UniProtKB/Swiss-Prot annotation:
Superkingdom: Bacteria
Record's GO cellular component terms: plasma membrane
GO biological process terms, semicolon-separated: sodium ion transport
Membrane topology qualifier: Multi-pass membrane protein
Upper lineage: Bacteria, Pseudomonadati, Pseudomonadota, Betaproteobacteria, Burkholderiales
Gene Ontology MF annotations: symporter activity
Protein name per the record: Uncharacterized symporter H16_A2524
Family (UniProt): Belongs to the sodium:solute symporter (SSF) (TC 2.A.21) family.
PANTHER family in the record: NA(+):SOLUTE SYMPORTER (SSF FAMILY), SODIUM/PROLINE SYMPORTER-RELATED
Keywords of the record: Cell membrane, Ion transport, Membrane, Sodium, Sodium transport, Symport, Transmembrane, Transmembrane helix, Transport
Ranges annotated as spanning the membrane: 12-32, 41-61, 84-104, 110-130, 162-182, 194-214, 221-241, 377-397, 413-433, 495-515, 548-568, 573-593, 603-623, 645-665
UniProt-listed PROSITE patterns: NA_SOLUT_SYMP_3
């Protein structure tokens, strides 16, 4: 067996080495085509379609109906390649697209994501990885049902049921974020509408996972990791070399950051910049007056908007103006309560733009000491939620089942940290490089001479980039630029003036990041529903073939529903990902840790703990996140000023407390559970 595993590893090294060489050759060939004046749009098509075709071929080659292959890739994935697959599973659209963007927009505060996501793997390696692999199984609900099952065949059904619900919910929220990332990439680089881009992405996701399950997903994820890391590192190095003559800008990040800080301070002192911020200060005052006059102001603003729209139609105004006003009318609040919520948010945005821009180096910038304390609290709690969420995500933990041994599992986590760090040490550098490009080549530019990339990105729907001459001086000011952080990485090659082939490469990398995570998430949901619900709760006599077929049908249904939800545009990518982490942490972290390290934890305690943790986190998000408050009309107060993305800060303690209290109030577990815990922790 060791010799066979060694031959298998050498064969994989050869295959993926050739794939990497082929990737560089393909990029070089596309560069030559661009130099020969090939259409840039067609280059974008080729990059996206060729890479998806490669993933589809791997998925087709790895198709299987074997149960072990479909659920856990026969538990024979070597540590090196499982580390790459974990990294690809982990480095979602949020990491690839969103991380550099949030560092660009928020500066120091964005480091919470780097610290939380990286630190979480320490918890995985020391608290969970060896014990879950030693148990085996197919899903996380499998482990929980057995640990809290008191030796019953099939384990404890209530524990399994609530674990399936929690796994499906947090994975589904995360899945929506990935499909949204795919839609953004496709919309920009192929030029289709966002809804069409979503279903294009759906096809890409399904070709990787539908036929081969975990086996197909594992080997496509290895290829996708290579694609995304090559795309990211090449882009960072080329931007740095073109403008700063450095091939490894990560080593001089501190110097670049000092230059940025000096430029930011200079901008804040310029009169034109101050005039723009004064405009937004006045807008905030007007919105406050409008809020104070509710509900009368609601009817007045609605009627005024209707009158303007009717006037445009009567005068046969340009269709663009009519469409813009129709969109504004469609987004107008439906009642005074919703108006108050929306105008409060707009007032907060205007106030934020009226203040000094966020420094790249200043921790917790704020106008008052109380606001600074609130920001510090949110920073710390977000790091906490991301760390424990990392250690609780079902699609990551399931990968621990795919290695040949406990030792290989530990090694694969170590490799995963290394592969993830390659991107994470480069993301802050890319954010700084792109911001430097903004300061050098956009801020201070006449509006009549805007670069072509600005024109292109202003056309993207939903809007991700906007710029308006607020003070009427005809010159772009820093405060006049409004952008979604998600566009920074995708636009980076164009902003830096690199060849379009690099834009195609970064788009292919972003697509790989979204597809790799989406595949893992989709498989987690489908396997939980087919294995834990269908097999364990509906039909215990189902054949292996029927179970795999059921998993494929469920996978297709979940993918279609997730695409529909994504088309509703529920929020930015980074918030959805953060919410998924809080939900996973609140529901799974307490019962996993207690289940391994405290023998006294009972099934009743586990059910109550998961329900309490998940319930608290879901409630806090629903009553505080604008997308849900607009839908439900329910508005809540933020506890201690904590953002809804960090709802796990309340859910995790609630889960621990309830699980411990209920366990102490209920009878002890059967001796078989004590023996199971001893076995897991032995050696």
């Amino acid at each position: 067996m060791p010799e066979a595993q060694s031959r298998f590893r050498r064969r994989l090294l050869l295959y993926y080495g050739l794939f990497t060489l082929g990737l560089f050759g393909f990029v070089g060939m596309m560069g030559l085509l661009e130099k020969s004046n090939a259409d840039a749009l067609w280059l974008g098509y080729v990059f996206l379609f060729i890479t998806i075709a490669i993933y589809a071929c791997i998925g087709l080659i790895c198709r299987t109906s074997d149960l072990n292959e479909y659920y856990v890739a026969s538990r024979r994935v070597p540590a090196l390649f499982n580390g790459m697959a974990i990294a690809a599973d982990w480095m979602s659209a949020a990491s690839f697209i969103g991380l550099a963007g949030i560092l660009f927009a928020s500066g120091y505060e964005g480091l919470a994501y780097v610290m939380g996501w990286t630190g979480g793997y320490c918890l995985v390696a020391f608290l969970l990885a060896p014990y879950l692999r030693k148990y085996g199984g197919y899903t996380i609900p499998d482990f929980l049902a057995a640990r809290y099952g008191n030796g019953k065949p099939g384990g404890n059904l209530p524990v399994r049921a609530i674990a399936v619900l929690a796994a499906s919910l947090c994975s589904f929220v995360y899945l929506v974020a990935q499909i949204q990332g795919v839609g953004l990439v496709v919309t920009r680089f192929i030029g289709v509408e966002f809804a069409v881009g979503i279903f294009f992405g759906l096809a890409g996701i399904l070709v990787c996972s539908f036929l081969g399950g975990m086996r197909a997903v594992t080997w496509t994820q290895v290829a996708q990791y290579i694609m995304m890391i090559v795309a990211f590192l090449v882009t960072v190095s080329m931007i740095a070399w073109k403008h700063h003559h450095e091939a490894l800008p990560q080593l001089s990040y501190g110097t670049l950051l000092s230059q940025l800080d000096a430029r930011e301070q200079q901008l804040e002192r310029e009169p034109a910049e101050q005039a723009v911020r004064e405009y937004y200060r006045q807008q905030a005052i007007l919105l406050q007056e409008r809020i104070a006059r509710l509900p009368d102001s609601f009817a007045q603003e609605r009627d005024a908007l209707d009158a303007r729209l009717q006037d445009l139609r009567t005068r046969n105004a340009p269709l663009r103006d009519i469409k813009s006003l129709e969109r504004e009318r469609l987004e107008f609040p439906r009642d005074p309560a919703a108006a108050q919520q929306q105008w409060n948010q707009q007032r907060a945005d205007a106030l934020a733009r009226s203040r000094h821009s966020l420094s790249s180096t200043e921790p917790y910038p704020a106008a008052s000491e109380q606001e600074r304390k609130t920001k510090r609290l949110n920073f710390v709690l977000l790091v906490f939620c991301l760390m424990v969420g990392t250690a609780s995500l079902p699609h990551i933990l399931t990968r621990l089942y795919t290695t040949p041994s406990v030792k290989e599992t530990r090694n694969s986590v170590a490799w995963a940290v290394f592969f993830i760090a390659l991107l994470y040490v480069s993301a802050p550098t890319l954010a700084a490089l792109v911001k430097f490009e903004f300061f050098q080549h956009l801020v201070g530019t006449p509006y009549a001479e805007l670069p072509q990339w600005v024109v292109q990105w202003r056309k993207v729907d939903p809007p991700v980039f906007g710029i308006r001459d607020v003070n009427g001086d005809g010159i772009v000011q820093w405060a006049e630029i409004l952008l979604q952080p998600d566009m920074i990485v995708l636009a980076a090659p164009e902003i830096a003036g690199l060849p379009y082939v690099i834009s195609g490469l970064i788009a292919a990398g972003a697509l790989a990041a979204a597809l790799s995570t989406a595949d893992g998430l989709l498989l987690t949901i489908a396997n939980a529903l087919s294995h834990d619900v269908f097999y364990h709760m509906v039909d215990r006599q189902a054949s292996h073939q029927r179970r795999v077929t059921t998993a494929k049908i469920v996978l297709l249904g979940v993918a279609l529903f997730a695409s529909y939800v994504t088309s509703l545009r529920p929020g930015n990518i980074l918030f959805l990902v953060g919410a998924a982490f809080s939900l996973a942490a609140s529901s799974f972290f307490p019962v996993l840790v207690l289940g391994i390290f405290w023998r006294r934890t009972t099934a009743a305690g586990a059910v109550a703990g998961m329900a309490a943790g998940l319930g608290v986190a879901v409630y806090y998000i629903i009553v505080n996140y604008p997308f849900f408050t607009r839908m439900t009309g329910i508005f809540g107060n933020r506890w201690f000023g904590v953002d809804p993305i960090a709802s796990g800060a309340f859910g995790v303690p609630a889960g621990f407390a309830v699980a411990i209290i209920v366990s102490l109030l209920t009878p002890r577990n059967a001796p078989v559970i004590d023996r199971l815990v001893s076995y897991l922790r032995k050696g």
